[in-house]
């Protein structure tokens, strides 16, 4: 058995185990075996191997619509819905308070995030943590942090349209389940993906927008700030608007 065949078999076993666990939670205790048709040597020889299939994008579990982040993560599984799975180490789902009032959405995992399986843990992640803790007086556990795509793009390139299309239903479902009061979109790509706009981030940032009925504030990505520290003051202005809005929501 080749390495790729072994990987496929392992993935199949994991998927089957998850399916059986779902069925058990639904009360299913046995599955009737369908009648197996007899295959003649002729049909066996003429049968061509089935082409590789792309997994169907769905936010429905076997029990129906998913109702928690845990179920959503379980449905994503060892995702192979786009080519990003070929080079990733971990699916980087998201982290934080499932009932957060504030949600940060970035572009996609980088090298550190891919290795750890957690968003924003590298140098850019430390800067975001400083914004949350030192600037806003919150903790990472108070907010929720996710990305537009859940797997690292090669060489940290921008995700391609088909990759975004594969991940977008899961991000939308995350937002539906968390239902934050405010979303902070970090960086050009996240902003344009969420707002479906090609307007430059320099014109969008600092102004309130709406996504799925939720207030959205675009601002620069922490990685951009590492390269352009002079623009930190602009992000701070954006964050102060977010803090003011959060205070009015709590009033």
Per-region residue spans from a language model:
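A polyanion-binding, active-site-adjacent surface
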Residues: 10, 14, 18, 22, ...
């Amino acid at each position: 058995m080749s390495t790729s065949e072994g990987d496929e078999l392992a993935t199949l076993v994991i998927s089957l185990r998850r399916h059986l666990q779902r069925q058990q939670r639904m009360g299913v205790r046995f599955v009737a075996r369908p009648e197996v048709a007899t295959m003649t040597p002729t049909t066996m020889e003429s049968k061509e191997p089935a082409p590789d299939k792309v997994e169907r994008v769905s936010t429905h579990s076997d029990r129906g619509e998913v109702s928690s982040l845990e179920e959503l993560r379980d449905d994503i599984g060892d995702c192979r819905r786009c080519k990003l799975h070929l080079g990733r180490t971990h699916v980087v789902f998201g982290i934080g308070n499932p009932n957060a009032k504030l949600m940060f959405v970035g572009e996609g995992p980088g090298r550190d995030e891919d290795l750890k399986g957690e968003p924003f843990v590298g140098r850019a992640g430390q800067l975001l943590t400083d914004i949350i803790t030192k600037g806003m007086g919150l903790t990472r556990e108070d907010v929720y942090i996710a990305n537009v795509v859940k797997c690292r793009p090669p060489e940290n390139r921008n995700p391609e349209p088909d990759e975004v299309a594969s991940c977008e239903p899961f991000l939308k479902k995350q937002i539906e389940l968390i239902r934050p009061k405010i979303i902070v979109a970090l960086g050009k790509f996240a902003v344009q993906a969420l707002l479906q706009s090609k307007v430059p981030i320099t014109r969008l940032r600092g102004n309130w927008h709406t996504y799925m009925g939720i207030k959205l504030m675009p601002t620069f990505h922490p990685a951009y700030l590492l390269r352009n520290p002079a623009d930190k003051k602009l992000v701070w202005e954006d964050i102060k608007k977010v803090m003011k809005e959060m205070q009015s929501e709590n009033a």
